[in-house]
Amino acid sequence: ASANLFDLSISFGGLSPLPGFAKLSGPSDDEPALFVAFLGFEGNRAERIINQLEPPPRVIPIVGAPGFQINYPAITVACNRAFLGDFDCNSDIRLAKASCPFEAYEALASIRRDFPDHYLYIAPVGTRPHALGAIRYAIANESHCEILFDHPVRQSNRTNGRGIIHVFSFI
């Protein structure tokens, strides 16, 4: 599988904050940083985002496993093979159930516990539940993280069929 096996987006609006998540300043010059990427099928998205950071921080990827289907985690890793190799982060892959924003949140909390002095750049370019967990984490921990998003313009007719509906309560 290549990074472009799944063309789910026709273009990208560029790296800019999500509404309500703009930050005037990132980490201080002496504060170490991590790039935490929730990976999906579009293997070029995480690399496009990290290439905007100077210098590129250490990468910790998160893969949705178990996935929505049994083969999806393997497809995700295959589609991100170049990114994982370029940033030498295969051994740092973390897992969070693809359909669970709470596991995504906990994965970020675990990374923060492992790297308590690091600023987290979070790229939610994987599943929507992972994006929800990342946003929830950013709301609760705004002083040491920020969301980086590339605003994809979706391909028409990119998916078909129906699946299980997931309902979450964040109260």
Residue ranges of model-derived segments:
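A short, acidic, amphipathic alpha-helical segment used as a generic capping/interface helix at domain edges
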Residues: 100-118, 130-136
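Short, surface-exposed basic-aromatic patches at helix termini and helix-loop junctions that form
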Residues: 50-55, 110-115, 135-144
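Structural motif
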Residues: 33-34, 58, 119-121
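Short, flexible loop segments at boundaries between secondary-structure elements
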Residues: 2-6, 142-171
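Active-site glycine-rich loop that binds ribose-phosphate moieties when present
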Residues: 4-30, 41-47
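Gly/Ser/Thr-rich loops at beta-strand to alpha-helix junctions
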Residues: 1, 37-47, 66-68, 121-132, ...
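Long, charge-dense
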Residues: 1-19, 66-68, 75-84, 154
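Redox- and metal-dependent alpha/beta enzyme cores, enriched for Fe-S-associated oxidoreductases
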Residues: 38-111
